[in-house]
Amino acid sequence: MATFKDACYHYKRLNKLNSLVLKLGANDEWRPAPMTKYKGWCLDCCQYTNLTYCRGCALYHVCQWCSQYNRCFLDEEPHLLRMRTFKDVVTKEDIEGLLTMYETLFPINEKLVNKFINSVKQRKCRNEYLLEWYNHLLMPITLQALTINLEDNVYYIFGYYDCMEHENQTPFQFINLLEKYDKLLLDDRNFHRMSHLPVILQQEYALRYFSKSRFLSKGKKRLSRSDFSDNLMEDRHSPTSLMQVVRNCISIHINDCEWNKACTLIVDARNYISIMNSSYTEHYSVSQRCKLFTKYKFGIVSRLVKPNYIFSSHESCALNVHNCKWCQINNHYKVWEDFRLRKIYNNVMDFIRALMKSNGNVGHCSSQESVYKYIPDLFLICKTEKWNEAVEMLFNYLEPVDINGTEYVLLDYEVNWEVRGLVMQNMDGKVPRILNMNDTKKILSAMIFDWFDTRYMRETPMTTSTTNQLRTLNKRNELIDEYDLELSDVE
């Protein structure tokens, strides 16, 4: 029993403005929709159900019914979901605008209550005030919201969400913004609305209001790779595939600085209808390059590493070793379809092997060495502390020699041409015979930064940008990269 969905269904019939604003996919005829994947609350109709991916941001936040309208909370078009979405910092004035919008769209007065009661009492059995028949009148005005942190912005999607105790498999978390407003003023608003209801319904209204306005906020969740769908990718088998984003826009572009003012547009119904009549869609192809996806890929690589290779004498590169149970890697994993990761893995392992051979560590690929446990961490460049510790443990394992207070290790074993070029590029055009700790870190990080320079990467994919940001980046041709041409970040 989704209260917000029911309220939109019944209040949609009040006037022309409501019929436009409160139109939900969940209340319309069902159309074929994508398969659902996660359990959570649909941001569009606020019901707890199975969710599918959004075509505007790739996050799972829309039910299979509402997905037919392709609405995203990051849209420019001021539909109901967008008007309920606020960005930090939320002021008391912003909340006043939200409450005014609620009062305009979902009014409760004596005349309206009698109208709804008369429409329900069609048969003798409906003389009782059963909650399921009057659910649309039992939606209190609260400051309950779902929140998510994207890049440097915190978004709050206000609404009336039932079943807060249910399992939440999405990155959105419940937050109570009552502290940003006056508690007594909000109580007064709801008591006034409640006074027009029959006594039996007043009790249920009060119970719902206090349960949704006095709860404790939950801690924010961290985004993970699984929170984003692969369905927006042009080619799911290509690691450098672009993601197709669809955004709903209007002819009068609204500045992001005025983000929280969208809910005030319905004050002038004629102007709002005119704005909505100018709506259209914009399509963008954006790169999937970001720290979140990169961290996920390197996490898989670190679990597939065969550290025994650093003591081997194989002539082939690390990924091309065959018929050796200690060094042969399973290269059938999808992650190895990414040529960048193949290059990084081969180069890092080749360089480490050169260090081992140069410093007299005579071993064989079948030997068991204590340094092996640190090799996988050398690919976790996004986890700075863990990566630094791994490089330091590797360097100390090589038994460096102290020269004038600085420790050095040798580098006089043959490396492949690609590694040689990277070393020269980062060591003033030379291949040094000795390296200190900083040199070793510089070379190892350069091998990864050559393709994945995480120092200058976004935390989340560009699908989480606002429509104005996408429009600006598109004008600068900064939505895509050149990886399909095998050009690295450095090139």
Curated annotation (Swiss-Prot):
A motif (pLxIS motif) lies at residues 485-488. It comes from the Viruses. Keywords: Host cytoplasm, Host cytoskeleton, Host-virus interaction, Inhibition of host innate immune response by virus, Inhibition of host IRF3 by virus, Inhibition of host IRF7 by virus, Inhibition of host RLR pathway by virus, Interferon antiviral system evasion, Metal-binding, RNA-binding, Viral immunoevasion. Residues 320-491 are annotated as: Interaction with host IRF3. InterPro entries: Rotavirus_NSP1. Residues 42-79 are annotated as: Zinc-binding domain. Interacts (via C-terminus) with host IRF3; this interaction leads to IRF3 degradation. Interacts with host IRF7; this interaction leads to IRF7 degradation. Interacts with host CUL1 and CUL3. The integrity of the zinc-binding domain in NSP1 is important for degradation of host IRF3. Plays a role in the inhibition of host innate immunity by inducing the degradation of key host factors required to activate interferon production such as IRF3, IRF5 or IRF7. Associates with components of cullin RING ligases (CRLs) including CUL1 or CUL3, which are essential multisubunit ubiquitination complexes, to modulate their activities. Belongs to the rotavirus NSP1 family. This is Non-structural protein 1. It comes from Rotavirus A (strain RVA/Cow/France/RF/1975/G6P6[1]) (RV-A). The lineage of its organism: Viruses, Riboviria, Orthornavirae, Duplornaviricota, Resentoviricetes.
